[in-house]
């Protein structure tokens, strides 16, 4: 197991995952440099060369995550999701640092050729739909080509459940209201509580796993409709207010996979503890007041 003497370097520290990862690392008293995307533009190769040093463990949380916006901003999406990670990988390889690159379930399309869907393994064939998905897969490929010892971690349906714009946060607010809420029932995946994901990434950093593509998501599979009803139940609202509809009733610029649940089997085989079941994680996320799940955007003190 790798020691805690290594400096943890977090990119995208102002985002949903990056801010929670930074907060968790601070609570654990780790030596850390956490920089927001405004402080560190990962599309600038000189920045990576300047910041990353020998022995660092870099966790790349920086990403262009506007799935629909990527359809009209392809160049930006590829710059942040593919070229930027490549710069990080090259810098890590050059100085002798480690790299954990966060990717997405969007690299899969849910087509099992008529067979019964089952959670995707890291070795399953990818088939990204849309600009965002293609840019994230390109990032994975660029990272591993530049630095084969890097670790790529795919996750899915990440949420805080707080005051933000993630699915659970939105459903939580709707549960407090009245009337019917229509939610698609033909998109199935692995909801992942951001706090659990942050802890999983730190465990991976400590384990020193290299040169692998792994999946890290809360256990279990559910549709968006089922997830929404679970949110209502946890909030004490009537789950019958949530009604199933098809994705065709909510057309979006970018396509969504019909099924993108992720298997944790390889995560466990790597000696890591799989994340708990999604329903247990959801209960934890919703047990606290909504505003308490939002991270203070002022980053904890870090040192160069």
Swiss-Prot record:
Lineage of the species this protein comes from: Bacteria, Bacillati, Actinomycetota, Actinomycetes, Mycobacteriales
UniProt GO MF annotations: dTDP-4-dehydrorhamnose reductase activity; metal ion binding
UniProt name for this protein: dTDP-4-dehydrorhamnose reductase
GO BP field: dTDP-rhamnose biosynthetic process; polysaccharide biosynthetic process
Disulfide bonds: none
Known function: Involved in the biosynthesis of the dTDP-L-rhamnose which is a component of the critical linker, D-N-acetylglucosamine-L-rhamnose disaccharide, which connects the galactan region of arabinogalactan to peptidoglycan via a phosphodiester linkage. Catalyzes the reduction of dTDP-6-deoxy-L-lyxo-4-hexulose to yield dTDP-L-rhamnose.
Protein EC: 1.1.1.133
Native organism: Mycobacterium tuberculosis (strain ATCC 25618 / H37Rv)
Binding site for NADPH: 16-17, 41-42, 63-65, 132, 136
Binding-site list for NADH: 15-17, 41-42, 63-65, 132, 136
Positions of the catalytic residues: 132 (proton donor/acceptor)
Pathway(s) this gene product operates in, as recorded in its UniProt entry: Carbohydrate biosynthesis; dTDP-L-rhamnose biosynthesis
InterPro entries referenced in this protein's UniProt entry, alphabetically: dTDP_dehydrorham_reduct, NAD(P)-bd_dom_sf, RmlD-like-bd
Residues at which dTDP-beta-L-rhamnose binds: 104-105, 157
UniProt keyword Lipoprotein present: no
Gene3D superfamilies to which the protein is assigned, alphabetical: NAD(P)-binding Rossmann-like Domain (3.40.50.720), UDP-galactose 4-epimerase, domain 1 (3.90.25.10)
């Amino acid at each position: 197991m790798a020691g805690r003497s290594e400096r943890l370097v977090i990119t995208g520290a102002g985002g949903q995952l990056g801010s929670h990862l930074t907060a968790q690392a601070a609570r654990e008293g780790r030596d850390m440099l956490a920089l927001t995307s405004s402080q560190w533009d990962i599309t600038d190769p000189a920045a990576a060369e300047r910041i990353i040093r020998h022995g660092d463990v870099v966790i790349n949380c920086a990403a262009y995550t506007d799935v629909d916006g990527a359809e009209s901003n392809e160049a930006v999406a590829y710059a942040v999701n593919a070229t930027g990670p490549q710069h990080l990988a090259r810098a890590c390889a050059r100085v002798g640092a480690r790299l954990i690159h966060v990717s997405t379930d969007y690299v899969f399309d849910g087509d099992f050729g008529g067979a019964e869907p089952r959670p995707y393994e890291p070795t399953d064939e990818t088939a990204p739909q849309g600009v965002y998905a293609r840019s994230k897969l390109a990032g994975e490929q660029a990272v591993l080509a530049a630095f084969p010892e890097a670790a790529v971690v795919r996750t899915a349906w990440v949420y805080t459940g707080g005051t933000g714009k993630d699915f659970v946060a939105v459903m939580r607010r709707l549960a407090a209201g009245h009337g019917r809420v229509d939610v698609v029932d033909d998109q199935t995946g692995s909801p992942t509580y951001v706090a659990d994901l942050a802890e999983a990434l730190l465990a991976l950093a400590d384990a020193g796993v290299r040169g692998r593509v792994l999946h890290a998501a809360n256990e279990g599979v559910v549709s968006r409709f089922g997830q929404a009803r679970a949110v209502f139940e946890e909030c004490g609202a009537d789950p019958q207010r949530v009604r199933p509809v098809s994705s065709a009733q909510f057309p979006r610029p970018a396509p969504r996979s019909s099924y993108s649940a992720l298997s944790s089997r390889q995560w466990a085989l790597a000696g890591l503890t799989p994340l708990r079941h999604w329903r247990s994680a959801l209960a934890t996320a919703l047990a606290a007041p909504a505003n308490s799940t939002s991270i203070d955007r002022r980053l904890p003190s870090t040192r160069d």
